[in-house]
Swiss-Prot record:
This is 33 kDa chaperonin. Belongs to the HSP33 family. Gene3D superfamilies: helix hairpin bin (1.10.287.480), Hsp33 domain (3.55.30.10), HSP33 redox switch-like (3.90.1280.10). Disulfide bonds join 234-236, 267-270. Under oxidizing conditions two disulfide bonds are formed involving the reactive cysteines. Under reducing conditions zinc is bound to the reactive cysteines and the protein is inactive.
Length: 302
């Protein structure tokens, strides 16, 4: 293993085996993860699942071929309604969850139980240039990691091992995968994947890439590339909220403001608040939509 410094707190590290067609990615997010969990009072079981999904999003975004955003979601109909994590080609991330805050959730409650047994996994690619793409598959397997392995077997048809973990302090992930269109004997793949499976959840959350890769592969060390660091950053803005209000239409938005005096939109990720009063809404639509909702004659505004 080369001596590239790979102990950064919020980093994705690529590695490849020169003597066999196997590649891998390691992710450990510390400061980023701690910033995200401070945004809401997540129950322990949901916090753990969200951290795993965040690590998964950063792992999968390592395969983005173009600039854009990768969004991974887990949706259900139980106590947990949604987990969502985003990772961009600019190496920023954000994540959040929605759940029934009146429900009692045990610290060790399984993902399947949280989702009500009918969960789905949604992966969305939003390129900066081009059309978005989305894939949806049912939740199969008892964990986010197994769900992703099943998804990648279907979509890429490549042998893949994924491990995910999250604690209060950090979220971590490991992906090991056969290279496409390369011949690899089963014994070599079984050797690498078996070693990868010996990594514990505690080690994955606590250890940086250098220690993880030495712990697993010190007898057949991979070539390690320069780490890619990540930061927490929300992409919400007043302009995006304005676009959303325009999509809702003047009749609906004007009606809310006529009744309540203003309309307030909270960002689920960073909890920024965007308030639009009567003047703001009328200017946005270019006419007195609030007045119309109050029964006044329709007229434009400057």
């Amino acid at each position: 293993m080369n001596q590239t410094a790979i102990n950064r707190a919020d980093a994705r590290t690529r590695f490849i085996f020169d003597d066999m067609p196997v590649r891998g990615l390691h992710v450990r997010l510390e400061n980023v993860w701690q910033h995200i969990v401070k945004q809401k009072n997540y129950p322990a079981a949901i916090r753990c699942a969200l951290g795993e999904l965040l690590a998964a999003g950063v792992l999968l975004s390592g395969n983005l071929k173009n600039e854009g955003t990768l969004i991974v979601q887990v949706q259900g109909q139980g106590k947990l309604k949604m987990l969502v994590a985003e990772a961009t080609s600019d190496r920023t991330v954000r994540a959040t969850a929605r759940w029934d805050e009146t429900a009692e959730i045990a610290d060790d409650e399984s993902l399947g139980d949280l989702l009500g047994g009918n969960g789905v996994f949604v992966l969305t690619l939003q390129p900066k240039d081009g059309e978005p793409w989305q894939g949806v598959v049912p939740l199969e397997g008892g964990s986010i990691a197994q769900m992703l392995v099943n998804y990648m077997k279907r979509s890429e048809q490549l042998d893949t091992h994924i491990a995910l973990s999250a604690s209060d302090e950090a979220a971590g992930g490991l992906l090991v995968q056969r290279l496409p269109e390369e011949v690899l004997d089963e014994e070599a793949w079984e050797h690498v994947s078996t070693l990868a499976r010996t990594l514990t959840a505690e080690e994955l959350a606590e250890l940086d890439a250098q220690h993880v890769l030495y712990r697993l592969f010190h007898e057949t060390p991979p070539r390690v590339f320069e780490p890619e660091t990540f930061e927490s950053s929300c992409t919400c803005s007043r302009g995006k909220v304005s676009d959303m209000l325009l999509m809702l239409g003047g009749e609906e938005v004007g009606g809310v403001v006529a009744e309540q005096g203003s309309i307030e939109v909270d960002c689920d990720f960073c909890h920024s608040k965007y308030v639009f009063d009567e003047t703001d809404v009328n200017a946005l639509f270019g006419e007195d939509v609030v007045g119309v909702a109050k029964g006044l004659p329709r007229h434009t505004v400057q």
